[in-house]
């Protein structure tokens, strides 16, 4: 489904005769893809398991390179961007979230204590619906993650980890938002919460929801 919402800061995405074949495989996973997501649009993509949806996401994130054709962001081929500059355009939320054994605040800001905006971190945790739990921790947002790895560290449930990753996406404010089956392992209540957060998170951005 499509919802058009052209806003400043959003980017356009074009798949131009794009294909991808995994090394050692004779059969392409994706072949001759041609479609455009206009700046500010919100696209939902559905398909059977094994149809290549996650491969498409990895291509768009720059983790894989197309074996044919190209992908353009705002008319510019992904390969023509500096890596750091390109990664700055994307916020992503995946099904299997890997949190770092750092503090909650550092996970949200993707940075060190010296360059983070602590007020923004807390606001993003509130938007993601996680602050109420974190506020009960003695060290609040300074609590370390990685229970069993660090002293006084805590563990988060699958749903809570998804919320933390969403807070990270809120914090980054990248113009392109990608969610790859973020609700696949969640119960119906947590799934509904993710959809509600997605609406907030995708405001003013181009977004792709798998």
Describe each PLM feature range:
Residues 1-4:
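Transmembrane helical bundles of ABC transporter permease domains
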Residues 6-210:
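ABC-type nucleotide-binding domain
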């Amino acid at each position: 489904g499509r919802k058009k919402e052209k806003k400043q800061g959003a980017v356009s995405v074009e798949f131009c005769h794009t294909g991808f074949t995994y090394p050692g495989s004779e059969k392409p996973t994706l072949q001759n893809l041609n479609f455009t997501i206009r700046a500010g649009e919100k696209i939902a993509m559905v398909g059977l398991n094994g149809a290549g949806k996650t491969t498409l996401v990895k291509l768009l994130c720059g983790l894989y390179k197309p074996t044919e054709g190209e992908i353009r962001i705002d008319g510019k081929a992904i390969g023509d961007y500096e890596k750091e500059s390109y990664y700055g355009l994307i916020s992503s939320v995946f099904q299997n979230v890997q949190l770092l054994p750092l503090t909650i605040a550092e996970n949200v800001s993707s940075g060190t204590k010296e360059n983070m905006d602590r007020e923004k971190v807390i606001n993003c945790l509130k938007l993601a619906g996680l602050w109420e739990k974190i506020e009960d921790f003695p060290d609040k947002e300074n609590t370390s993650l990685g229970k069993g790895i660090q002293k006084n560290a805590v563990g988060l449930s699958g749903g809570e980890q998804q919320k933390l990753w969403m807070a990270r996406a809120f914090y980054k404010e990248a113009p392109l938002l990608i969610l790859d089956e973020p609700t696949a392992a969640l119960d119906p209540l947590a799934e509904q919460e993710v959809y509600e957060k997605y609406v907030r998170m995708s405001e003013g951005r181009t977004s792709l929801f798998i």
